[in-house]
Amino acid sequence: MASSVISSAAVATRSNVTQASMVAPFTGLKSSATFPVTKKQNLDITSIASNGGRVSCMQVWPPINMKKYETLSYLPDLSDEQLLSEIEYLLKNGWVPCLEFETEHGFVYRENNKSPGYYDGRYWTMWKLPMFGCTDATQVLAEVQEAKKAYPQAWVRIIGFDNVRQVQCISFIAYKPEGY
């Protein structure tokens, strides 16, 4: 008998803790008839919705002669110091640097079909082989300079390839031809 009293007390304590943390059930929407209704007859559009003036308007990216190429391509061209910093980040993460270039279109375009495919500007020509084992950012920058010298009218980008997961992790434009 004593054991049954103890177990029932333990059960009662446990249920009280559960009940204390429970949320009351939803009882439904209240009728609007109980609240006084006042209508404002101002037909001014500015009085309908307001956010307190906290929004500052941003301009839309101009699409004419301002093509976007890669992530953050709307920023000014990277200097050599900034390129070295990006390449060091790529190497610090253990990614393999690889250079690619495109001589005609440095942006996504569709020439043969309306749906995306192989020839829509996403696949660039690889510059030499991926730089497996590279640990020096200046080596990569020297390859960028060599690619610029060989193809001055081409776009050059640097990608960081993760050879364990076999995915491209970073990609950025290192050089754009004059006028872009």
From Swiss-Prot:
The basic functional RuBisCO is composed of a large chain homodimer in a 'head-to-tail' conformation. In form I RuBisCO this homodimer is arranged in a barrel-like tetramer with the small subunits forming a tetrameric 'cap' on each end of the 'barrel'. Belongs to the RuBisCO small chain family. The keyword Membrane does not apply. The keyword Chloroplast applies. This is Ribulose bisphosphate carboxylase small subunit, chloroplastic 2. It is found in: Plastid, Chloroplast; Cell junction, Plasmodesma. Its main location: plastid. SMART domains: RuBisCO_small. Keywords: Antiviral defense, Calvin cycle, Carbon dioxide fixation, Cell junction, Chloroplast, Host-virus interaction, Photorespiration, Photosynthesis, Plastid, Transit peptide. GO terms for biological process: defense response to virus; photorespiration; reductive pentose-phosphate cycle. GO terms for molecular function: ribulose-bisphosphate carboxylase activity. Heterohexadecamer of 8 large and 8 small subunits. (Microbial infection) Binds to tobamovirus movement protein; this interaction seems required for viral systemic movement. It comes from the Eukaryota. The gene is RBCS2. Residues 1-56 form a transit peptide. GO terms for cellular component: chloroplast; plasmodesma. RuBisCO catalyzes two reactions: the carboxylation of D-ribulose 1,5-bisphosphate, the primary event in carbon dioxide fixation, as well as the oxidative fragmentation of the pentose substrate. Both reactions occur simultaneously and in competition at the same active site. Although the small subunit is not catalytic it is essential for maximal activity. Involved in antiviral defenses. Coiled coil: none annotated. Pfam families: RbcS, RuBisCO_small. It comes from Solanum lycopersicum.
